[in-house]
Amino acid sequence: MVRVKICGITSLEDALMAVEAGADALGFVFHEDSPRHVPPEQATGIIAGLPPFVQTVGLFVNRPIAYVNETAARCRIDLVQLHGDEPPEFCAAVERRVIKAFRVQDITSLDPIKHYRVAAHLLDAYSPKAYGGTGLTFNWDIAAAAKEFGPVILAGGLTPDNIREAVEAVNPYAVDVSGGVESAPGRKDAAKVREFIRRAKA
């Protein structure tokens, strides 16, 4: 069964709602340019209120390695998601398991993947304007092809309306959603979250 990560959590209320709906992991965005940015102290408080067996993921974009490791330790997050231009040697210096994001334009976007030794590869749609959270989709056949390099987390424009089709097309290790289940940036819509998870795991 595919696993589901709900990203862009900004409140304990949304976090607990997502867990109750069946989310396997929650994402916290430590990228100040994002409308879903959450300060480390706020994330720490939310994470402290979570029940056991829920994985937490911290998302970083081109931050210094010291900041990544210090924030991960301070907030007690389980995995680090690197969504910028971080090279393989940067990933190797992270003191948590790493999910490396790759922004997909075409099949050549997979070329760098083989150089990374990480826990999973997250595939998101390319946009020249942002490092993620754009709501754009990409060719899911490329995501299916990426599975030969390791576990794939499918992201990019996923919604309750297209998640079933996406899972059937790719059969990814996990799916990642943010804007597709929101009523406003950083505010999750409970009905959308429940429907997304139900269809993803159907």
UniProtKB/Swiss-Prot annotation:
CDD domains, sorted: PRAI
NCBIfam families from the UniProt entry: PRK01222.1-4
UniProt name for this protein: N-(5'-phosphoribosyl)anthranilate isomerase
Associated pathway: Amino-acid biosynthesis; L-tryptophan biosynthesis; L-tryptophan from chorismate: step 3/5
GO biological process: L-tryptophan biosynthetic process
Keywords associated with the record: Amino-acid biosynthesis, Aromatic amino acid biosynthesis, Isomerase, Tryptophan biosynthesis
UniProt cross-references to PANTHER family, sorted A to Z: N-(5'-PHOSPHORIBOSYL)ANTHRANILATE ISOMERASE (PTHR42894:SF1)
Catalytic reaction annotation: N-(5-phospho-beta-D-ribosyl)anthranilate = 1-(2-carboxyphenylamino)-1-deoxy-D-ribulose 5-phosphate
EC number(s) per entry: 5.3.1.24
Top-level EC class as recorded in UniProt: isomerase
GO function terms (MF aspect): phosphoribosylanthranilate isomerase activity
Highest taxon listed in the record's lineage: Bacteria
Family annotation (HAMAP family): PRAI
UniProt record similarity statement: Belongs to the TrpF family.
InterPro entries: Aldolase_TIM, PRAI_dom, RibuloseP-bd_barrel, TrpF_fam
